[in-house]
């Protein structure tokens, strides 16, 4: 039951962060491309790499893993919104933007997971 509370707390923080980042990206870049989703996915992927690597090189408690990995990052990143936005771009006739959205989200997020891991591994 303890871990459930950590997931809930982390999830509430991740959801608020997602909301604030999405608003910021909309204000900065406008609504022509789903930059908010892209940014939360990049940030969440990087942090997932860091958390994973920290778990490999040191003891990370189950509560911290639940709080960050499942709760905060689970609420911060979103595959369903990314998928819906990509489909909407296609349906609206923006095929190049849709393909770019998919390639950039997947490619960059895999790369920043790697960067997060390397950041931790280079220090241990």
Swiss-Prot record:
GO cellular component: plasma membrane
TM region positions: 5-27, 42-62, 63-83, 95-115
MF (Gene Ontology): fluoride channel activity; metal ion binding
Its membrane topology: Multi-pass membrane protein
An example Gene Ontology biological process: cellular detoxification of fluoride
Major location (coarse): membrane
Coiled coil: none
Keyword Cell membrane applies: yes
Catalytic activity reported: fluoride(in) = fluoride(out)
Residue positions binding Na(+): 74, 77
Cellular compartments annotated: Cell inner membrane
Record comment: activity regulation: Na(+) is not transported, but it plays an essential structural role and its presence is essential for fluoride channel function.
Keywords: Cell inner membrane, Cell membrane, Ion channel, Ion transport, Membrane, Metal-binding, Sodium, Transmembrane, Transmembrane helix, Transport
NCBIfam families xref list: crcB
Family statement: Belongs to the fluoride channel Fluc/FEX (TC 1.A.43) family.
Job description of the protein: Fluoride-specific ion channel. Important for reducing fluoride concentration in the cell, thus reducing its toxicity.
Name of this chain's protein: Fluoride-specific ion channel FluC
Organism, as annotated: Shewanella piezotolerans (strain WP3 / JCM 13877)
Gene of this entry: fluC
């Amino acid at each position: 039951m303890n871990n459930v509370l950590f997931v809930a707390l982390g999830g509430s923080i991740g959801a608020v962060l997602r909301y604030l980042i999405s608003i910021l990206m909309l204000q900065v870049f406008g609504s022509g491309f789903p930059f908010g989703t892209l940014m939360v996915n990049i940030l969440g992927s990087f942090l997932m790499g860091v958390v994973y690597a920290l778990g490999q090189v040191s003891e990370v408690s189950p509560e911290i893993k639940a709080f960050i990995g499942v709760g905060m990052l689970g609420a911060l990143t979103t595959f369903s919104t990314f998928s819906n936005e990509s489909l909407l771009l296609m349906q609206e006739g923006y095929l190049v933007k849709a393909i770019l959205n998919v390639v950039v989200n997947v490619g960059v997020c895999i790369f920043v997971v790697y960067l997060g891991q390397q950041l931790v591994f280079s220090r241990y």
